[in-house]
């Protein structure tokens, strides 16, 4: 209960909750649209999705501040690769929120001289770059974690006077792939924050990929990805120890 209270008291927590609701509506709407007699339910879900999306706009200032703070923190990272990737990713995220704010200003009628499609495409590009850079950082962290697991395993097998598993694997492609996937599984299992961050970024990137026409998805896939990403984000907000730390 304390974790939930702390979660809802944070701007990031409320935004994740609204976001999860929005993508749940999108997913349910996609599943129910082909079914006869569900028109009213689909319409209600569409209205709720729109209302929640509009409500999330009020968290914009908090998101911008959070992105700026994240940029300042990433600059001081000791490792070059995370420092470079996270700084550029957070800068792109700040620009994305600025573009999103400009779109919001147009949508509420404060100005009419804004090209909606142009700014929407700009926002999607910067969001895509932010997620792509975050995934590069995740891949780098995964490679380091896999090296640690390999070394630890080799030490244990050496102390037990056994031949290391990694040197006994046959060179056939299928066995190599199995060994790699097993190592990847063990690496992520031992580092839950890295697993959460990777899953979150992979799910999030589906949306800009679709908007930019790089890889088309249906609303069901985007809704499911957004829901999974939101749940992962909610976990990191409620339990800060599950957030991937910057070294």
Curated annotation (Swiss-Prot):
It is found in: Peroxisome membrane. The keyword Transmembrane applies. GO terms for molecular function: protein homodimerization activity. The chain crosses the membrane at residues 84-105, 220-239. One of its GO terms (biological process) is signal transduction. Keywords: Membrane, Peroxisome, Peroxisome biogenesis, Transmembrane, Transmembrane helix. Disulfide bonds: none annotated. Residues 106-219 are lumenal. Its main location: membrane. Changing residue 9 to D: No effect on peroxisomal location. May be involved in peroxisomal proliferation and may regulate peroxisomes division. May mediate binding of coatomer proteins to the peroxisomal membrane. Promotes membrane protrusion and elongation on the peroxisomal surface. This is Peroxisomal membrane protein 11A. The gene is PEX11A.
């Amino acid at each position: 209960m304390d974790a939930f209270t702390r979660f809802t008291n944070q701007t990031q927590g409320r935004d994740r909750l609204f976001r999860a609701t929005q993508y749940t509506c999108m997913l349910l709407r996609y599943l129910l649209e082909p079914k006869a007699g569900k028109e009213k339910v689909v319409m209600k879900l569409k209205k709720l999705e729109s209302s929640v999306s509009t409500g999330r706009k009020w968290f914009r200032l908090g998101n911008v501040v959070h992105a700026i703070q994240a940029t300042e923190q990433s600059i001081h990272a000791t490792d070059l690769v995370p420092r470079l990737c996270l700084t550029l990713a957070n800068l792109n995220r700040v620009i994305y929120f600025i573009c999103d704010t400009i779109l919001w200003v147009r949508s509420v009628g404060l100005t009419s001289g804004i090209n909606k499609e142009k700014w929407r495409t700009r926002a999607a590009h910067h969001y895509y770059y932010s997620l792509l850079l975050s995934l590069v950082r995740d891949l780098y962290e995964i490679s380091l974690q896999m090296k640690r697991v390999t070394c630890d395993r080799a030490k244990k097998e050496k102390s037990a006077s056994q031949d290391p598993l990694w040197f006994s694997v046959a060179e056939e492609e299928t066995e190599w792939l199995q060994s790699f996937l097993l190592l990847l599984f063990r690496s992520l299992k031992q580092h839950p924050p890295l697993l959460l961050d990777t899953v979150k970024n992979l799910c999030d990137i589906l949306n800009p990929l679709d908007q930019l026409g790089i890889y088309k998805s249906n609303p069901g896939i985007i809704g499911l990805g957004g829901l999974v990403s939101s749940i992962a984000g909610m976990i990191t907000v409620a339990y800060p120890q599950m957030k991937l730390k910057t070294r």
